[in-house]
């Protein structure tokens, strides 16, 4: 109760934090800041007890501290706001490619396709037609129209890996758990649509 909190003004985080403290009847002293860099500086200088932003932002900022382990990211989730890829308005083809890239990585995870086995799985027909479609042996409708080769998803999975591999490589080292970013079968929110 009564902690000072560095909070970026004009953001949904500011509103969500105010609601969280009101609902939980906790008093706090907001320390208004304008940028993440300013929040980091004020927090490290001790001008606020707590620093708040999106979980991924907290984790990546904490990783830059001299002693990251001396700082704790609290487990409370104040709000649920989806973060994802963004493309400029009006480039529908690029938006489709970005969207299907994410879906292909999630489908790869769901189907057990990894960077280690993608090329092998893509070299012969499989018993699972969805794997065959995803890896280009039974080309997806619309891939060529979007300017993609029939093995576009195979290339992504072989070079980058599935969603879990990418998450584990890039975000897990920051101390982030999958949480809602897991597949629906694993208790998360990611539902992989049929690959057709």
Residue ranges of each PLM-predicted region?
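A ligand-binding cleft/hinge motif common to bilobed small-molecule-binding domains
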Residues: 16-23, 37, 44-45, 49-73
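Solvent-exposed loop/turn segments at secondary-structure junctions
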Residues: 10-15, 36-38, 56-60, 79-80, ...
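N-terminal hydrophobic or amphipathic helices and topogenic motifs
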Residues: 99, 103-196
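Bilobed "Venus flytrap"/periplasmic-binding protein-like clamshell domains
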Residues: 1-40
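Short, well-ordered beta-strand segments
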Residues: 4-8, 51, 86
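Periplasmic-binding protein-like
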Residues: 63-102
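Extracytoplasmic
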Residues: 12, 25, 80-82, 96, ...
